């Protein structure tokens, strides 16, 4: 009799759990996301880009304005892989490759960046309100902005998602957009690495999203790139030179494309450079190339530079770069600013 009672109780418990656990899971999924976390970011100024020539300002076609070494005790700070500067040159939005937003405001003394204020971080949210990380949508490597809409490229799952940032801010939910079928052929750690939005009204390709693969290449070894949306969607290629890989891109106000590149060798070290691709060259099926604006190595103040953005200030075009420290104590999170020298 006791055995039968225990058995009946066990069956009853299983029945209750069968109903209660899914209901609890649904309630958990329905819970609102936590609010953004205010964080403190310490900023150490970088007075010279090349410590061997501390008074030098011109590097290639760029003039060094200043930089910062950024640190924070917040556990999710680091791994910054993309950046968008607001038109005011102070407010910014960035993303880490772990799927976290970072926004804040750069302070200046004259034209030199001196600190970061009003910094906040929050996890990116998927379509159902769960975090991207919980969906295993890893490596949020690229970002581009079109007004109130922010596009983010997710490397490991070969996706591009859009956020209604203007409406919901850091609590916006990702909405996948249609991407070219070729994305599925990219290596899992070499998919979409760079996104740039061609400004509306800047020419025939205005309103197009440009996506560039890190290690997706054609049979000649050139970088695969894509015009998505806009008036003339389709693939094109960027000439690969000197073994550099693409790490980010951004569009100038006239539509010209700035491509941030890097290469690393255990015996040669780390190098970065920026190329300018005229927008007039870009079209479906085209092979494009352009001049190098700057090339730097570890003799200068660089690290694993993964984000680039542009804004206008005082009649100058200002480039802001940020590095991904891979959450390593051996690397740094650098924010660097340059102005584009007149041609």
Name each model-derived stretch.
Residues 9-17:
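Gram-negative bacterial Sec-dependent N-terminal signal peptides
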